[in-house]
């Protein structure tokens, strides 16, 4: 007798059949997205000056890459520029594709200039399980000042956003601009030779335009229809500055950060650090008969800093007056440049959106680390010919290790080939000495706390190990907000605040959010403060964690995690592709 429709065996068969159908449908829905990036020189004019920059496909900013959750991307990069180049896919998890992550001398050697061997490389990676706004950028020298673009990952066909569907969207890339007499590579080179800070940019940009002229010639324009709701996709591609972002007479609902959905957060100002992205809904319902400035302004977390800049774009309604000369333009009221209270209120108010079937915070912790970081002083290198050898060279460190990139082989290649002499697996779990990290007066009286040494030391992790890291900012040579980016993973932000973490934890003044913390790939650790992050090391490879203030990476404000293979083939990193760039 055949089993009834309600029997256990039939239900199991139906469930298995349904799962197979869903899996097959997901495969059908997934696509292969292909692009070719030609990197080369481009002459542009900004602020009344013609300048040669490095760009992709003759565009600044570079081309927008669009995909859907589950797609595979193949991006062939051809280097026609005079410089070594790599491309990093910022925020892409690179599951089992660490060879495509992109940081020079970490996961690959650079793509060489010219037309010979090693002058092109195809980045191959999948974006299953990711949705939202990410971006791509050069990961060599200061080239990312002009070599960058948006990477948008939409839900699978037929899958809605977990927020009200917008009528349309605008992608806004926020950047910096140098009117350099030489090139940006020379700006970094000069800083290296002197052992000091690089020259400041002269302007901020929105989609490559500074928007400083009242004639609006060099200004990005946004068109909106009254009554519609728009998804603003914001990317901070600036090299060295966090930014306040506002639109005059408009408010936002933040729905995602770093391509991770959040609970809706209502605000009139967005704070965004270099490397971070924000997705926010904006309703176009302002008063008619006006136009509205969109503004991105420097947020200075350094005490006594005076440098400020603002970029502007222009928001126009479809029904505004045709006579622009008679139209009132409204400007947003921006925070003061050092308004850390507004910054921390924004960052501290975000929580993660809980969704059925999606990962939650790992409750067990296998490894706990305390990573202190900040600026430091190191002896001048022989090649630093303009460095003051009495004073020393400006440096930076994590747990008093100033990270040095290898010169002959990438860290990932060295790890996989078990090559010796390239790096060591002994990055410390704690700083060499515990002190009152944020007491500037005490710290800067102790010269021993300012001196660091170079090293290429990484932290080895077992596959699937859960790691909790206390990121403690220090007051050595000043306090500022360092945005730290972790490659290869999203992490949960369990808590963040100002002061000395260990003093506060002893006083039981810290409460970790283990229910719905925000997820990120880049965290702006508060000036003179700390953050607690947690992630699971379920992605084999070598993954950089570094400050996304571009000047601080060559100073040494970085470290790396070397994650071992898992026990099964689907948890093991495949060999490098055939066109993997040689050193």
Curated annotation (Swiss-Prot):
Identification of the protein by name: Laccase-14
Tree of life domain: Eukaryota
One Gene Ontology cellular component annotation held by this UniProt entry: apoplast
Protein family per UniProt: Belongs to the multicopper oxidase family.
Chain sites annotated for binding Cu cation 3: 139, 487, 546
Organism: Oryza sativa subsp. japonica (Rice)
Cofactor binding note of this UniProt entry: Binds 4 Cu cations per monomer.
Compartments, record wording: Secreted, Extracellular space, Apoplast
């Amino acid at each position: 007798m055949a089993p009834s429709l309600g029997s256990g065996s039939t239900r199991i068969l139906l469930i298995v059949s349904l799962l197979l159908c869903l899996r097959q449908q997901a495969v059908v829905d997934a696509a292969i997205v292909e692009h070719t990036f030609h990197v080369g020189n481009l002459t542009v004019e900004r602020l009344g000056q013609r300048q040669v920059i490095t760009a992709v496909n003759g565009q600044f900013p570079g081309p927008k890459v669009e995909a859907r959750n589950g797609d595979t991307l193949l991006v062939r990069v051809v280097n026609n520029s005079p410089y070594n180049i790599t491309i990093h896919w910022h925020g892409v998890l690179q599951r089992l594709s660490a060879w495509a992550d992109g940081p020079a001398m970490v996961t690959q050697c650079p793509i060489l200039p010219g037309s010979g061997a090693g002058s092109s490389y195809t980045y191959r990676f999948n974006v299953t399980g990711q949705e939202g706004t990410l971006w791509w950028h050069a990961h060599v020298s200061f080239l990312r000042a002009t070599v960058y673009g948006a990477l948008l990952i939409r839900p699978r066909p037929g899958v809605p956003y977990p927020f009200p569907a917008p009528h349309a969207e605008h992608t806004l890339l926020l950047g910096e601009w140098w009117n350099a007499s030489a090139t940006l590579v020379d700006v970094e080179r000069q800083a290296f030779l002197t052992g000091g800070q690089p020259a400041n940019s002269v302007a901020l940009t929105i989609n490559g335009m500074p928007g400083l002229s009242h004639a609006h010639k060099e200004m990005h324009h946004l068109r909106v229809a009254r009554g519609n709701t728009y998804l603003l996709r914001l990317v901070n591609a600036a090299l060295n500055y966090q930014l306040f972002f506002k639109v005059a007479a408009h408010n936002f609902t933040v729905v995602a950060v770093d391509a991770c959905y959040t609970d809706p957060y209502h605000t009139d100002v967005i704070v965004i650090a270099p490397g971070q992205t924000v997705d926010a809904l904006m309703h176009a319902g302002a008063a008619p008969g006006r136009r509205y400035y969109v503004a991105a302004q420097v947020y200075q977390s350094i005490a006594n800093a005076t440098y400020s800049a603002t970029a502007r774009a222009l928001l126009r309604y479809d029904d505004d007056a045709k006579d622009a000369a008679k139209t009132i333009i409204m400007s947003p009221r921006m925070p003061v440049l050092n308004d850390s209270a507004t910054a921390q209120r924004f960052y501290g108010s975000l929580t993660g959106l809980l969704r059925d079937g999606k990962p939650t915070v790992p409750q067990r912790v296998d490894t706990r680390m305390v990573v202190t970081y900040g600026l430091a002083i190191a002896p001048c290198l022989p090649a630093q010919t303009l460095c003051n050898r009495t004073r020393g060279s400006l440096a930076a460190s994590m747990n008093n290790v100033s990270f040095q990139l290898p010169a002959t082989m990438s860290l990932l290649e060295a790890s996989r080939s078990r090559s010796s002499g390239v790096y060591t697996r002994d990055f410390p779990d704690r700083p060499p000495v515990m002190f009152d990290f944020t007491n500037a007066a005490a710290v800067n009286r102790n010269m021993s706390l300012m001196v660091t040494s170079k090293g290429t030391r990484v932290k080895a992790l077992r596959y699937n190990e859960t790691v909790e890291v206390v990121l403690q900012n220090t007051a050595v040579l000043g306090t500022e907000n360092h945005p730290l980016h972790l490659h290869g993973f999203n992490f949960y932000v369990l808590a963040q605040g100002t002061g000395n973490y260990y003093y506060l934890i002893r006083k039981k003044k810290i409460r970790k959010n283990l229910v719905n913390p925000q997820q990120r790939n880049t965290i702006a650790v508060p000036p003179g403060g700390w953050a607690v992050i947690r992630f699971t090391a379920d992605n084999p490879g070598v993954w950089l964690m570094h400050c996304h203030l571009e000047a601080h990476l060559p100073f040494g404000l970085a470290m790396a995690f070397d994650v071992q293979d898992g026990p099964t083939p689907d948890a093991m990193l495949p060999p490098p592709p055939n066109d993997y760039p040689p050193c």
